[in-house]
A protein has these predicted regions:
Chain A
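A bilobed periplasmic-binding-protein/Venus flytrap-type ligand-binding module shared by bacterial periplasmic
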Residues: 90-91, 226-230, 298-320, 324, ...
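N-terminal lobe/hinge region of extracytoplasmic solute-binding protein
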Residues: 58-108, 139, 538
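Aromatic- and charge-enriched surface segment that lines or borders ligand/interaction sites
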Residues: 102-147, 162, 168, 311-313
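Ligand/substrate-recognition segments at binding pockets and active sites
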Residues: 378-450, 522
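Detector for C-terminal structural segments
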Residues: 23, 218, 222-223, 324-355, ...
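Ligand-site clamp/hinge motif
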Residues: 231-282, 410, 423
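Structural transition elements
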Residues: 212, 306, 341-381, 400-406
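Surface-exposed binding/hinge segments that line
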Residues: 151-194, 200-201, 211-218
Length: 550, 308, 300
C-alpha cells in the first residue's frame, strides 16, 4: 500500500516539479539556503493546498520524556512544542509578544512580573486555562525538578494567583532572562488535571493547550499527535490562528543516519532531521527534496579547556593550543561549507554577541611554539615536548556516538597539536559524566541551546562547577567574571547587557579558555510537498503552519 | 516422555532464575555509577544525587539490594525503569512480539537458505555448485550485520523501493532485517548440513536404499536430508542466543522496536530493572527454544523417540 | 558501483578455478586464496609501514573524498587520508582484537570445559549449570555491559568480546574430553599406573583439541565482527590509527556519496573473516573428518 502511494506521489510531484522549476527560474542549487522556500513560492503553492494529511517527521533520537518541565533535550522540545503553548512568544529578532499571556508588567525593582492571561483558552482535556493552572505548573517543576525548566526560571521564588486570570511571579533577584525562559517550550504550560491524573507517568501522557493533542508514544518507534480542533490561539509568529491544517503528526524515531535520510528520499517519511553535511549537496540535487537549515542559538560548539589542571592552568599554554588549532580547516574539512565557523562562545543570533571577535584569532604555529618554549617545554625525542621528565599531554574528552562529527574534530585537533609537540590523548566514551566528575580531562567540547546570553552563567560562574550542578567545564573561578554575570542577569537595559556580555566573551577568548568551533545549523530534509515549515529563534521546528500539498 | 519434559521444565526454570541472578551480580560488580548515568547531561546538585540514590535504595549494601531484587522477582514484580519510571513488565511485553517476529523470521531464513545451500553443496560435492554454495554461506557470516543491513537497505528500499525502510508494522518491514540476521545463521547451517549429508550419504542404509532401486532424488531428499536436519536443528537452539544478540544491531539499523534496543539502552544507562527484565525474557526464550528443539528431534528422527 | 566491488573477488575465483581445474581441487584453491589473504593481512598487521604508501595520520583537507585512482588505490576518506593505508594499518588492531579475544575466551572457556569434562561428578554438574546459565545471557549483553562500564580501550574491548565466547569454548572442550576420556589408550595408561595429571596432559588433552582449535580459528573472525558491532553501537575505541570496525562504522554515513570510504574496510573484514573460516573448515576436515560437527552439537 505504501509503495502504491509513493508511486502516485511520484506522478504528482513530476507535475508539481515542473511548476516548481518554472517558478524557481534559474535552477541553481545553493548548498547553504537557510530558508529555500521563498515567500513568493510559498503563496503561489499554498493556493493549491488542501486541508488535512499526516506529517511524518523522522527524529534521530528519542525524547526522554514529554513532560516539558522535566526534559533537557532538544529532541523533546521538537515534539512537545506542538502540544504546549507558552505564556509569551519570542520572535526571531528576540522581542517578546503576547501568547497565553495577553499582557504583562514588570515592577520597578525588576523582582515582580504580573501576567494577564487569555480568558478563552482551554486545555486539550477540557480543563480551563487560568492563573491556578499556571501556578500548578511552577509547583510541578519545583517538585519534580529535572531538565532545563528550573534554570530557565533563574531566581524564581514564588508564584501568586492574583485573580482567576492574573498571575504574579516573584523573584528573589532581578532576572532579565525570565521572559526568554517563559517563551521556551521547556516552560510550556501543562494541564494541572493531567498532572494529578497521571502522576509520575505524566511524561508519557502530556496534555497542553497547543495545536496538537498527544495520542500515543511507542517506545523507540513513534510518537503520534493529532489535531486539536478547538485551537484558536496560535502564536503571533504563525500565519495560522485556528486549528492546524494537518490532521496528524507522526514522529518516527530512526537513529541510523542512512535509514533516516533514506526514508525521506524514498518518500516513506515527509521530513527527516539532522542531515549530515556530505549528503546536503546530494539531497539538493534531488528534485523532490528540499533541505532547510536553521541556525540554533545559545552557545556555539566550543572546546572548553580545563583551567584547573596543569599545565593548562597557564594562560600561555592555553594560548599555544589556541594558536595551533586551525579551526577554519576543521570546519571546512568536516562540514564541507555547510556549517559556519564560530568566533565566540555565543552564537551570532543571540543578544550581546560580540562580532568584534571575528577574525581575531589566527593560527600561528611559530608563535604557539614560542609560547611553549617560554614555559620551558622542550622538544623531546619523539616530537612531543617534555618538561621535568613529563610529556606535554592534553586529555581530550568527547562523547560517543559521533554526534555532529565531534569525534572527527578531536582527530584533527590531535594531528594539529602534534605539530607543536603536544600529545593529545583521546578519550571518546559514552559516559562523559564520570571523567568530568573526577576532573580527568583537559579539554571538552559542548554546545547549548538557549535564547538568552545568561547561558554563560552556567558555563563560567565559579559556583557552577559540574559537581555542583553546573556546566563550568573550564573551572573558571574569577570574582570579576562572577560579578559581570550577575550584572548581566539583573540589568534591564539591553545596551548595557550587550556591553557586559561582550566583556565576558572577550575574556574567554583573550584568556584562551575556549576554542569556538562551529555554529550548529539544525538541518532537515523534507519532501517538497511539505510547505510552511518554520523554525524559531533557537532553531526548533514549528509545525503548526505546515501544510501538505496533495 | 512427559516426565522428561517436566524435569526439563523444572531445570529450565532454575536456569532462568540463575541467569537473572548472575546478571544482577555482573551489573553490580561492573564500575559506573547508575545515578550519574541517570542524569545524562542534566546536571544536578550533589544533594539531589544523594537523595536519588536513597530513593532507589542504591545506598544499601549488595546483599540487601540483591535480596530485595530476588524477593520481588519471586513475586513476579520486575520493578520500574529508573530512567522513565515505566513499569518494566509492560515495557518489555510491548517489545517482545517485534523481537520474536524478527528472531523467528531470521531463524526461518537461516534454516531455509542454510539447508538448501548445504544440500546442494553436498550433492555436488567439490563441484562448482558446492564451491559457490559454500562461498555464499561463508560470506553471510563474514560481514558485520550493520553493514549487510545498510547495504540491503540502500539497494532494496532506497534504490528499488521494494520494502519499507524503517519501522515494525506489517510483514514487509520484516523482510530485510530477517534476511540480514538470517544470513548469519545460514552460514553456520550450510556447513553443518553439508558435512552431515556427506556422512549420511556414505552410511550403509543409503547404499541399501540405492541398491533397492530408489531414485536418487528420493534417497537424497527423503532419507539423507532428514538425517542431516538434526544437527541443523541443534544449531538453531544454540543460535537463538546469537540471533537475540544480533537483534540489538539490526533493530537499530532498521529502526525497529524490540527488546534488543531496549536492552542496549538500558545497559548503557545502567537501568538495572530493565536489564534484569530483558534478560529474564531472553533466558526464557532461549530455554524454551532449546526445549522445543529437543522435543522436535523425536519427530525428525524416530530412533530418538524410541530410545526415550 | 557496489556490485562490481563485491562480485569482483568471486569473479576472479571462478575464472582462475576454470584455468587450473585439472591441477587444483576447488576447495584447495579456496584454501590457497584464504591462506594468501591471511598471510598478506598478517604482514600488514606486523609491518604496515612496508605495505602502506602513506602515513595513516596524514590529514589532507585539499584531497577529501577522492575516488580510487592511481595515487590512491582505494580513494581518500573525509579527512583526505588514504583509504588503502587505513586498511593496511587497521589490520593491526583488528587482528589483535580477533586473536586476543579468542585467546582470552578460549583459555577461560577451555579450562572450565576441561575441568568439567575430566573431573566429572559434582564439579561437572556445577560448572555445566553455570555455563548453561551463561549461555542464556546474550553475548552482546556481556560485551555491551563490559565495554560500557570499563570505558573504551582495546584491552576492554577484548575482554568484552571474550566474555561472551566462554560458554561455547567450554562446551566444545568438555564434549571432546568426554569422548576421549573413555578411549582404550586412556584406560590402558591408567592401568599401567600413570598419574592422573600425566594421563590428562599426555593423552586426553592432545586428543581433544581438534574441535576446539577449529572453533578458535573461526572465533578470530567472529570476534572481529563482534568488535565492529560494538563500534557501530558507539562503544568502539577511537584512536589515532583506527581498526577496521571503527573505519567502517564511522565511514558508513558516506556510503551514498563516497562508497570507497567504507566499502574497502568492509571488504577487508569480510575477506579476512571469510579466509579464517575457510581455513578453520579445512582444519576441521583434516583433523577430524568423521566428527566434523562435534563442535556445535557437543555439550550436555
Amino acid at each position: 500500500m505504501k509503495i502504491e502511494r509513493s508511486n502516485k506521489w511520484i506522478n504528482h510531484t513530476a507535475l508539481s516539479l515542473m511548476t516548481a522549476a518554472l517558478l524557481a527560474g534559474c535552477g541553481s542549487n545553493q548548498v547553504q539556503s537557510p530558508n529555500p522556500s521563498a515567500p513568493a513560492d510559498q503563496t503561489a503553492a499554498s493556493a493549491g493546498n488542501e486541508q488535512g494529511g499526516e506529517l511524518t517527521y523522522a527524529l534521530a533520537t528519542s525524547p526522554d520524556t514529554l513532560d516539558a518541565g522535566a526534559s533537557g533535550f532538544a529532541v523533546s522540545h521538537r515534539v512537545f512544542r506542538n502540544i504546549f503553548d507558552s505564556l509569551v512568544f519570542q520572535a526571531k529578532e528576540g522581542t517578546f509578544q503576547p501568547w497565553l499571556a495577553s499582557s504583562w508588567t514588570k515592577s520597578e525593582d525588576g523582582k515582580e512580573y504580573t501576567f494577564k492571561l487569555r480568558t478563552d483558552v482551554t486545555f486539550q482535556d477540557g480543563t480551563p486555562f487560568n492563573a491556578a493552572a499556571v501556578k500548578a505548573n511552577f509547583d510541578h517543576i519545583f517538585a519534580a525538578g529535572r531538565g532545563q525548566s528550573r534554570s530557565l526560571l533563574g531566581t524564581f521564588s514564588s508564584a501568586e494567583v492574583v485573580d482567576e486570570h492574573t498571575i504574579k511571579i516573584i523573584l528573589s533577584e532581578p532576572f532579565e532572562p525570565l521572559l526568554a525562559g517563559l517563551g521556551s517550550g521547556f516552560l510550556g504550560i501543562s494541564s494541572p488535571k493531567a498532572f494529578e491524573q497521571y502522576g509520575d507517568q505524566y511524561g508519557k501522557h502530556p496534555v497542553g493547550t497547543g495545536p496538537f493533542k498527544f495520542v500515543s508514544w511507542t517506545e523507540n518507534d513513534q510518537i503520534v499527535l493529532e489535531k486539536n480542533p478547538d485551537y484558536k490561539w496560535g502564536p503571533p509568529g504563525a500565519d495560522n490562528k485556528g486549528p492546524s491544517q494537518l490532521d496528524k503528526i507522526t514522529f518516527k524515531i530512526i537513529p541510523e543516519e542512512a535509514t533516516r535520510i533514506g526514508s525521506v528520499q524514498s518518500g516513506q517519511v515527509l521530513v527527516a532531521e539532522t542531515v549530515p553535511p556530505q549528503l546536503i549537496t546530494a539531497l539538493n540535487n534531488d528534485p523532490n527534496i528540499a533541505v532547510d537549515q536553521s541556525i540554533t542559538n545559545g552557545t556555539a560548539f566550543s572546546l572548553y579547556i580545563n583551567t584547573k589542571n596543569e599545565p593548562w592552568n597557564e594562560i600561555k599554554a592555553r594560548q599555544a593550543v589556541q594558536l595551533a588549532v586551525d579551526v577554519d580547516t576543521i570546519v571546512q574539512t568536516l562540514y564541507l561549507g555547510t556549517y559556519e565557523r564560530a568566533w565566540s562562545a555565543l552564537t551570532p543570533g543571540i543578544l550581546g554577541y560580540d562580532s568584534s571577535l571575528e577574525n581575531k584569532v589566527k593560527p600561528d604555529i611559530a608563535k604557539a611554539n614560542q609560547l611553549l618554549d617560554e614555559l620551558g617545554w622542550k622538544q623531546g625525542g619523539d616530537g612531543i615536548r617534555e618538561k621535568d621528565g613529563q610529556k606535554l599531554i592534553l586529555r581530550y574528552l568527547d562523547g560517543s556516538p559521533n554526534r555532529e562529527k565531534r569525534n572527527d574534530i578531536a582527530a584533527i585537533v590531535q594531528q594539529q597539536l602534534k605539530q607543536i609537540g603536544v600529545q593529545v590523548n583521546l578519550n571518546i566514551t559514552k559516559d562523559t559524566n564520570t571523567p568530568i566528575t573526577n576532573g580527568e580531562y583537559d579539554i571538552f567540547g559542548n554546545s547549548q541551546v538557549k535564547a538568552d546570553p545568561d547561558i554563560l552563567r552556567n558555563l563560567l560562574r565559579s559556583d557552577k562547577v559540574f559537581t555542583k550542578g553546573g556546566t563550568n567545564w573550564s573551572n573558571v573561578a574569577d570574582p570579576e567574571i562572577d560579578e559581570l554575570l550577575d550584572q548581566g542577569a539583573s540589568e534591564s537595559d539591553p545596551q548595557k547587557r550587550k556591553e557586559i556580555y561582550a566583556q565576558i566573551q572577550q575574556y574567554m577568548i583573550d584568556r584562551a579558555i575556549i576554542l569556538p568551533i562551529y555554529v550548529f545549523p539544525y538541518t532537515v530534509a523534507h519532501s517538497k510537498k511539505v510547505e510552511g515549515l518554520k523554525f524559531d529563534l533557537l532553531g526548533y521546528p514549528l509545525l503548526y503552519d505546515v501544510t501538505i500539498r496533495k | 516422555m512427559t516426565g522428561t519434559i517436566a524435569t526439563r521444565l523444572l531445570t529450565s526454570l532454575l536456569v532462568v532464575i540463575g541467569s537473572s541472578m548472575l546478571v544482577f551480580v555482573i551489573m553490580f560488580v561492573l564500575p559506573g555509577d547508575p545515578v550519574l548515568q541517570m542524569l545524562d547531561g542534566n546536571a544536578t546538585t550533589p544533594e539531589a544525587i544523594e537523595q536519588m540514590r536513597q530513593q532507589l535504595g542504591l545506598d544499601q549494601p549488595f546483599y540487601v539490594q540483591f535480596m530485595q531484587y530476588f524477593l520481588q522477582l519471586l513475586q513476579g514484580d520486575f520493578g520500574a525503569s529508573r530512567i522513565d519510571s515505566t513499569p518494566v513488565l509492560p515495557k518489555i511485553l510491548a517489545h517482545v512480539p517485534a523481537t520474536l517476529a524478527l528472531t523467528a523470521v531470521s531463524a526461518a531464513v537461516s534454516v531455509l537458505v542454510g539447508t538448501i545451500l548445504g544440500v546442494l553443496s553436498a550433492i555436488h560435492r567439490n563441484g562448482i555448485i558446492d564451491l559457490t554454495a559454500r562461498f555464499v554461506g561463508l560470506f553471510g557470516i563474514s560481514m558485520p550485520t550493520f553493514w549487510t543491513g545498510i547495504l540491503l537497505l540502500l539497494l532494496f528500499s532506497i534504490h528499488l523501493g521494494l520494502f519499507p525502510i524503517a519501522g515494525s508494522d506489517g510483514w514487509k518491514t520484516l523482510v530485510l532485517p530477517g534476511i540480514t540476521l538470517g544470513l548469519v545463521g545460514a552460514g553456520f547451517i550450510v556447513r553443518m548440513v553439508r558435512n552431515t549429508m556427506l556422512e549420511v550419504i556414505s552410511e550403509p542404509f543409503i547404499v541399501t536404499l540405492r541398491s533397492k532401486g530408489l531414485t536418487e532424488r528420493v534417497v537424497m531428499y527423503k532419507h539423507a536430508l532428514r538425517n542431516a536436519l538434526i544437527p541443523a536443528l541443534t544449531m538453531m537452539g544454540v543460535m537463538v542466543g546469537e540471533l537475540l544478540s544480533g537483534t540489538v544491531v539490526v533493530e537499530t539499523v532498521f529502526a525497529r522496536q524490540g527488546i534488543g534496543r531496549i536492552l542496549a539502552d538500558a545497559i548503557m544507562s545502567k537501568d538495572m530493572p530493565v536489564v534484569q527484565g530483558v534478560v529474564f525474557f531472553t533466558a526464557i526464550i532461549y530455554v524454551l527454544v532449546n526445549l522445543l528443539v529437543d522435543v522436535s528431534y523425536s519427530f525428525v528422527d524416530p530412533r530418538i523417540r524410541r530410545s526415550q | 558501483m557496489k556490485e562490481t566491488t563485491i562480485t569482483k573477488p568471486l569473479g576472479t575465483t571462478v575464472h582462475l578455478h576454470r584455468y587450473r581445474l585439472r591441477r587444483l581441487e576447488p576447495s584447495q584453491f579456496f584454501l590457497f586464496g584464504a591462506g594468501l589473504v591471511v598471510l598478506f593481512l598478517t604482514i600488514c598487521a606486523i609491518a604496515p609501514q612496508w605495505v602502506a604508501p602513506y602515513a595513516p595520520t596524514m590529514i589532507d583537507p585539499t584531497n577529501l573524498l577522492q575516488p580510487p585512482s592511481a595515487s590512491h588505490l582505494f580513494g581518500t576518506d573525509y579527512f583526505g587520508r588514504d583509504v588503502f593505508t587505513l586498511v593496511v594499518y587497521g589490520s593491526r588492531d583488528s587482528l589483535l582484537i580477533g586473536l586476543a579475544s579468542v585467546v582470552v575466551g578460549g583459555v577461560l572457556g577451555g579450562v572450565l570445559g576441561a575441568i568439567s569434562g575430566y573431573v566429572g561428578g559434582l564439579v561437572d554438574l556445577i560448572i555445566m549449570r553455570f555455563i548453561e546459565v551463561l549461555m542464556t545471557i546474550p553475548g552482546i549483553l556481556l560485551a555491551l555491559a563490559i565495554a560500557a562500564a570499563l570505558g573504551p580501550s582495546t584491552l576492554n574491548i577484548i575482554l568484552a568480546i571474550a566474555s561472551g565466547t566462554i560458554p561455547r569454548y567450554a562446551r566444545v572442550m568438555r564434549s571432546s574430553i568426554l569422548t576421549v576420556k573413555h578411549r582404550s589408550y586412556v584406560l590402558a595408561s591408567r592401568s599401567i599406573g600413570s598419574s592422573e595429571f600425566r594421563i590428562f596432559w599426555r593423552h586426553v588433552l592432545p586428543n581433544s583439541t581438534a574441535p576446539f582449535l577449529v572453533m578458535a580459528t573461526i572465533g578470530i573472525g567472529t570476534s572481529i565482527l563482534t568488535g565492529s558491532g560494538l563500534s557501530f553501537l558507539g562503544l568502539g575505541v577511537i584512536k589515532e590509527i583506527p581498526d577496521w570496525g571503527t573505519v567502517l562504522s564511522q565511514g558508513r554515513g558516506y556510503l551514498t556519496v563516497a562508497w570507497w570510504v567504507c566499502t574497502f574496510p568492509g571488504l577487508a573484514i569480510a575477506l579476512f573473516v571469510l579466509s579464517v573460516n575457510v581455513i578453520g573448515d579445512r582444519i576441521r576436515d583434516v583433523l577430524d573428518p568423521k566428527k566434523s560437527n562435534g563442535s556445535f552439537t557437543g555439550g550436555s
